[in-house]
């Protein structure tokens, strides 16, 4: 017979690296603890259908990891969360710093400098895709502008000999557009056809193109530039992107936006310090305001910046070896699909395969494990599986487990909300666990709408102009017209004598 004391020794062992996440589903007085070291360094996955309690499990687990309620705690914990739907900003507000593309007064603005992206990803976004010949025209000019930039502002670790098109060196997209459009539209006059027929010089800063005399037939010209690459269409799209306010967090990144000479107020060290070096244990990157067309690229860029920085600084005190980092990836199936082939997918595969050596751990969170790359999922040493109804998803989870544990997955369709089967390196034995619920004010913002209550209420005045304003601005808190209210004290009228 297994006694309660035996169960407590098996599942509730106490140690420096043990964190409590809940209790046995069959015995509420027996805690379930996981090894923090194994949970972070050997990666983990939290999987479950919509409504199974994934978000609550993540919020509860992160609070357990940082040990806020313990005397010693984990003041040096470092967790980076990619929050796709903005669910965790309230749930973790007391232990996190929030960066958002559409920040409110309690959040910091999220900026991801475009010049830190790989050239291929950047060009694919700002031009809509290029042929090989057209891409060369852009990459050659980017290298030229970056080279000019490091000559004006020398940067540690790089010079003209080691510079590549992918080097994270500031350059001006406005200057790139201006110089390329100038070359494409130039016309010439003169006997040797080498005198530019310029009428107005334009302005790179305001994205006004230079104006040349129009091409004319005959011996006098003006003559077109025969060396032009035929890239006016992608240049027009680049200009449109630069003018689109929805992409300011990427193309106009605050202090990280280069001027026309490539000079920036802040370098990447300040960006990393903001994300990873503040006084809270958790950093939430709220991506709910990011347009879907750029979301995957943005996530890939964030992960690349963070991982490359920690990889190359592994011998330093700020590196991952001295101060490990846990990256929590919500809605992972959206950017880690088996056929994704994106920067995000490639970086996460690197983290999954080699992150343990450099102190970077991954926590994959998904409602569709079947749509997550098998390489990534198979590298997760700990599986926290909540209710899963889809047989394809269950089969994918089964495939990550040893044969003798596959039978446990037959329980997944009947688990209660907030119940999970935990297997892997962080758990001493496979266990059916009831996850500890955070208090009401620390629950994620993922509740279903109260349909009956909402439909039973009398309709109030509806302003669909506000709906359209939010749609156009891509901000949920947009207003139709800002009102200025002037408040002045009321003066008593003099009494009649």
Q: What feature does the model see in each segment?
A:
Residues 1-23:
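Charged, amphipathic alpha-helical linker segments immediately N-terminal to NTP-binding catalytic cores
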Residues 18-102, 374, 422, 454, ...:
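Glycine-rich phosphate-binding loop of nucleotide-binding enzymes
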Residues 82, 329, 365-366:
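Hydrophobic residues in beta-strands of the RecA-like P-loop NTPase core, especially within AAA+ ATPase
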Residues 86-92, 96, 115-347:
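P-loop NTPase motor domains
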Residues 100-104, 111-116, 383-392:
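Conserved AAA+ ATPase "SRH/arginine-finger" region at the nucleotide-binding site
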Residues 128, 344, 350-434:
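Conserved ATP-driven motor cores of ASCE-family P-loop NTPases powering translocation/secretion/packaging/pilus
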Residues 136-158, 410-441:
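Conserved AAA+ ATPase small/helical "lid" subdomain
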Residues 191, 206-214, 297, 417-497:
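Conserved P-loop NTPase motor module
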């Amino acid at each position: 017979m297994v006694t309660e004391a035996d169960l407590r020794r098996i599942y509730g062992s106490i140690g420096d690296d043990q964190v409590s996440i809940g209790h046995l589903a069959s015995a509420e007085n027996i805690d379930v603890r996981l090894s923090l070291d194994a949970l972070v360094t050997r990666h983990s996955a939290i999987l479950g259908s919509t409504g199974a309690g994934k978000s609550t499990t993540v919020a509860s687990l992160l609070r357990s990891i940082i040990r806020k309620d313990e005397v010693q705690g984990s003041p040096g914990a470092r967790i980076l969360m990619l929050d796709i739907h903005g669910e965790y900003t309230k749930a973790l507000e007391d232990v996190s710093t929030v960066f958002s593309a559409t920040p409110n007064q309690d959040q910091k603005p999220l900026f991801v400098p475009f010049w830190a992206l790989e050239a291929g990803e950047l060009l694919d976004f700002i031009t809509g895709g290029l042929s090989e010949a057209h891409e060369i025209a852009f990459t050659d000019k980017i290298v030229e502008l970056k080279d000019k930039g490091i000559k004006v502002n020398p940067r540690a670790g790089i010079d003209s000999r080691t510079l590549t098109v992918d080097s994270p060196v500031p350059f001006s997209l406005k200057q790139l557009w201006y110089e390329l459009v100038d070359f494409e539209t130039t016309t010439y006059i003169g006997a040797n056809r080498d005198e530019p027929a310029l009428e107005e010089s334009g302005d790179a800063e305001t994205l006004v193109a230079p104006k040349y005399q129009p091409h004319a037939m005959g011996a006098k010209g003006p003559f077109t530039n025969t060396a032009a690459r035929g890239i006016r269409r992608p240049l027009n799209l680049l200009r449109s992107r630069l003018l689109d306010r929805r992409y300011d967090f990427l193309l106009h990144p605050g202090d990280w936006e280069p001027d026309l000479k490539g000079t920036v107020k802040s370098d990447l060290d300040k960006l990393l310090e903001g994300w990873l070096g503040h006084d809270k244990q958790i950093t939430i990157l709220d991506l709910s305001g990011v347009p879907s067309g750029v979301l995957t690229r943005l996530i890939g860029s964030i992960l690349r910046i963070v991982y490359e920085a920690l990889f190359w600084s592994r011998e330093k005190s700020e590196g991952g070896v001295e101060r490990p980092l846990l990256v929590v990836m919500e809605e992972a199936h959206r950017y880690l699909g088996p056929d994704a082939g994106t920067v995000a997918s490639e970086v996460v595969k690197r983290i999954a395969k080699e992150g343990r050596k450099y102190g970077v751990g991954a926590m994959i969170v998904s409602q569709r494990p079947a749509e997550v790359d098998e390489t990534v999922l198979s590298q997760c040493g700990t599986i926290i599986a909540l209710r899963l109804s889809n047989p394809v998803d269950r089969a994918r989870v089964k495939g990550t487990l040893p044969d003798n544990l596959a039978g446990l997955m037959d329980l997944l369709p009947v688990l209660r909300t907030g119940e999970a089967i935990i297997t892997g390196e962080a758990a001493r034995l496979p266990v059916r666990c009831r996850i500890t619920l955070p208090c009401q004010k620390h629950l994620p913002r993922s509740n279903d709408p109260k349909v009956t209550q909402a439909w039973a209420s009398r309709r109030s005045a509806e302003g669909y102009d506000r709906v359209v304003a939010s749609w156009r601005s891509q901000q949920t808190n947009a207003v139709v017209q800002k009102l200025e209210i002037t408040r002045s004290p009321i003066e008593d009228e003099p009494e009649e004598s």
